[in-house]
């Protein structure tokens, strides 16, 4: 790591700590040349591979925007949407891959959204899964009811 003060090509790590709820590492560094200290923050970049093959950085804001559309007219606040986006990011990061297909991001949204608001879930699932008939909705509603009636896992 280059020193930002004297541009010396090496530095020594003095202290490392988790930051941003475990999503980043904050390091205090010391330059052996000028003796000054500086801080770096390291994060692992998570990339989303779209259907077209284009790669873009994962964006919680994009998740919130997409889910907000499904929640339009529903009693869902911004805090709940931000928490859902965090859950989605945690789930896709847990896969351990630096690149994740966009359809896996959509799948990661479905579970938390179903628990948050069933109507919003149906709206999102109908677009995401490309529902084309009333039967598609009926099947999904039956699956929702089965999930709701299933005993909670302990």
UniProtKB/Swiss-Prot annotation:
PROSITE patterns for this protein: ATP_CONE
Function: Negatively regulates transcription of bacterial ribonucleotide reductase nrd genes and operons by binding to NrdR-boxes.
Matching PANTHER family: TRANSCRIPTIONAL REPRESSOR NRDR
Cofactor comment: Binds 1 zinc ion.
Highest taxon listed in the record's lineage: Bacteria
Family: Belongs to the NrdR family.
HAMAP family (alphabetical): NrdR
UniProt domain ATP-cone: residue ranges: 46-136
Pfam family, one: Zn_ribbon_NrdR
The protein, known as: Transcriptional repressor NrdR
Keyword Metal-binding tagged: yes
Cofactor: Zn(2+)
Encoding gene per record: nrdR
Source organism (scientific name): Mycobacteroides abscessus (strain ATCC 19977 / DSM 44196 / CCUG 20993 / CIP 104536 / JCM 13569 / NCTC 13031 / TMC 1543 / L948) (Mycobacterium abscessus)
Stretches annotated zinc finger (unnamed): 3-34
